[in-house]
Amino acid sequence: MLRLEPILKQLPVKSYRAGDVIFKPGDTPKFGLIPLSGVINTYSCDHNGIERRIISAKEYELVPNNWLISPSVPVNYYYKAYTDVVCAIADRREFPRLLMSNPEALYELLLVQDNRMQAAKYRIETLIQPKAIDKLLYMFRYMVERVSLPTDKDIG
């Protein structure tokens, strides 16, 4: 993520403690977050108050994920710090300008968001498996894709 770092260093930083609710349904964020460390969960609550995790945001993933494209749309889900999180605070007007001035950083952010989308597809694929053993195997694949780091540029 070297190409994003010059942009992220220009942004203010805010910390959240594990368990902090960052956004609630109906909030219209005035800023976006880019986690520099830690994990933010996106979840919904059913009518019994049971949380249902939808997806997690890790390093360099936009929160809310549609914020850059639709900055004035209210969020539909809860966003909560799963771990202690340090985030860059992206201003609605300034952040797109910074990205447009650095095409390599913009491309890198696109790759990060694409990776997140692929992970979401794996998670959905996991949930629709009819057999428990298949759910476990697909969940393992999802976890490997989502949280593992490449050990070599030639090894996924």
Regions from the language model: what does each represent?
Residues 19, 30-43, 48, 59-61:
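Glycine- and acidic-residue-biased ligand/ion/polar-headgroup-sensing regions
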